[in-house]
């Protein structure tokens, strides 16, 4: 989503004038439309203010018409501060409001930018669940920003709707509230569960310091820790950027046991600007947890290497519907399922006995999400129920991870961080798994999960031409997490038309066999250490041509399974040159053989040279969407 930019001049003038409409210094500001559209901008003359149409008979902003456009938004800008957390809310009401003939909802979206108008991020507000049963037609939409990044000065609020909307929509009583300020969002480590017994460990901090008040060159940050002799030590970051401070330490140089490795940021004259810590534990030997990750991001289950290869699936099974597929799911090709809904212990054990592990979804009890069950829609009730579930199931060997994030908004960060800490305390044997479709948000969320997945679904999504996001997104995620989080990617095994029946798009279809194989191999070449496709039900539904994708998906998974030994090998040599339009990953097998997976990320033929450190150049020719596993010859052999 690309929001309309605010000009640098207008932002600067607003700041200098005190910005009567701003909230950088105010705790909360409420705005109605009693002064018409003063202070608001729009590009559609159909926006107006109607007296007595608002809540309690007040004024309301109204749009009425046909075939509206998202870009024809009613927009207003507010001054904000870097590091601040802001909650935005508005009341909305619709009358005969549809999109392509189907009832739809209005949209509240917000973007934040720097003083030059550079876009820094955005979020969409959600309808507050408690208002679904309202009787007067007014519903409340609310969203919360993350701690705003360094350089953020402006928050732009847009009241709008999706393209193709028709009917009437009304808005009233906008509120902007500053909740707090977090100059350091978090400090995290590169080690699973923030513990280790050998090698090195990286500590990374996400900075959100107001660099207008505290220019980077005036700051003196240090990481503080207790060393192996018991003395307090400190070291300057090896990497210091406007939004990041990082350092690498030897685990052996840390005191044994648990301690806080703390980042303290001071000014040159000694004033403390901010501090935050990562609890880290130096162990005496390798942890013996049921599920763990090694330094290469590979999963180990019960002491054996494990490459997740599975699907999102229904919860408990309808025997009549799934009987024809059960044998195909338990014949050794797939090894895990992620039931999207509550699943019984009996089902978990049934699949475990057949060699299929369960990634247990907690999404139905996650506070602040639309899928949360009604009885658990407070933060306290949500955490209490999840604690109960995990305590009940944590001894089940068939469970390999807890699924806690399903394309969550940034407003969920504090809850997910608390949830991860709770899960680590209750169950030391399993990781926390998160999936998102927002690569630009990954760094904000990085401290809330142990293993991450991106779910790019390019086929039929906005034309389906740019299939390369199947590798670009995981590459972005790896960079955003400092290459410190394992990755279980989510390939597309469904037809977008099933989700968007209001759209007329001839590209809506189930992925062809070559597309599906390409997306899977792209993900692996980009660094994925597992695949959990969305979704199994999608492979069994009939497409427009009357076929299903189950057979082609099963064939591709069988091919992938035949190469799992390669995918679980140690990393190979660095790639210095690759053909344009490709993504490449190398491995070194136990016998010393080096192999490379080369994937064409385009819908055109590609060719060029592949050069890996210490190995002879290889000529590559791949057809559109093609891929190949090739052996590399060491120089001098």
Model regions: which residues?
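Surface-exposed, short loops/turns at beta-strand junctions within beta-sandwich domains
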Residues: 251-257
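Glycan-processing catalytic domains of CAZymes
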Residues: 197-199, 204-211, 263-266, 272-635
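Extracellular and organelle-lumenal recognition/adhesion modules and their flexible linkers in secreted
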Residues: 23-248
